[in-house]
Design a protein with these regions (language model features):
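Glycine-rich, often acidic, oxyanion-interacting loops/wings at catalytic, nucleic-acid
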Residues: 1-81, 168-171, 178
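Short helix-capping/linker segments at secondary-structure and domain boundaries
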Residues: 2-6, 59-62, 101-105, 151-160, ...
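Short, solvent-exposed positions on alpha-helices
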Residues: 4, 60, 91, 201-202
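Basic, amphipathic alpha-helical segments enriched in Lys/Arg and hydrophobic/aromatic residues
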Residues: 187-228
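Phosphate-backbone recognition surface of nucleic-acid-processing proteins
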Residues: 80-90, 94-196, 200
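Short coil/turn segments at secondary-structure boundaries
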Residues: 5-11, 19-24, 65-66, 125-128, ...
Length: 228
């Protein structure tokens, strides 16, 4: 919200950042602080920037704490497995692990996807015509995985340096599973958009559903059957 307020404020006063493509970088923040504003306008922007810095510092502290929790004996191994997946970072991995607990209570991957509300519903009992996803189950995790799946719309083949670093210290078997899953999800999204002419939202939800299945496979040790 504070970012939107700052952008709206500068636009309203005729200022547009043109020295780079990315906002909220050091260069962008320096530009904001040096805008030639006076009086109440200067005070307003300074107040916005102070709020932004306060929120940013708080987020940094929380992220650091999350990293610390993820490295405890209780969560380390599971977290390190999940972050081998391209779109899954520490926060998402820890959230999924804490929310679900025992993944083996789901007999199959599709049961886990259904728990998250990521499977298609039916118009009526006995009717095979399918509607959109049910949106039943764990809303928080469903939204989290859909957000993760957004990354496949801009994913390229290959492996980024950041992903390689996240995969360090993990077994070759887990890395191989994650790599195959990452490529399959990328191709799945592209196929739905380019060949099946699905819109971005539908393709993203489909990718999120498969991502949920891969997460189930990773957490239950079924890393061969899910990709079969």
């Amino acid at each position: 919200v504070i970012k939107q307020q700052i952008c709206a404020f500068t636009t309203r006063h005729g200022y547009k950042f043109t020295d780079g493509k990315n906002y909220w970088t050091k260069k962008h923040l320096k530009w904001l602080k040096e805008l030639p504003l006076e009086g109440v306008n200067k005070e307003t922007l300074d107040s916005y920037l102070l709020s932004y810095e306060t929120v940013s510092d708080r987020i940094d502290q929380m992220n650091k704490r999350i990293e610390e929790i993820a490295e405890t004996d209780k969560y380390r191994e599971a977290v390190h497995k999940l972050i081998c997946l391209k779109s899954v970072k520490v926060l998402t991995a820890l959230a999924v692990i804490v929310e679900i607990g025992d993944f083996t209570r789901f007999v199959k991957a599709k049961n886990f996807a259904a728990f998250l509300g990521l499977v298609a519903g039916e118009l009526s009992s006995g009717d095979q015509n399918q509607t959109g996803i049910t949106k039943q189950g764990n809303t928080f995790l469903r939204k989290l995985l859909v957000e993760c799946a957004q990354s496949f719309s801009r994913a390229s083949s290959g492996k980024s340096e950041a992903l390689k670093k996240r995969q360090e210290g993990t077994t070759p078997e887990v890395i191989a599973y994650a790599d195959k899953a990452n490529e399959r999800l990328r191709k799945r999204y592209m196929c739905l958009v380019l060949h099946n002419r699905k819109n971005h939202n539908k393709a993203t939800v489909a990718a999120a559903r498969e991502l949920a299945c891969f997460i189930w496979g990773m957490m239950t040790g079924n890393i061969h059957t899910v990709l079969a």
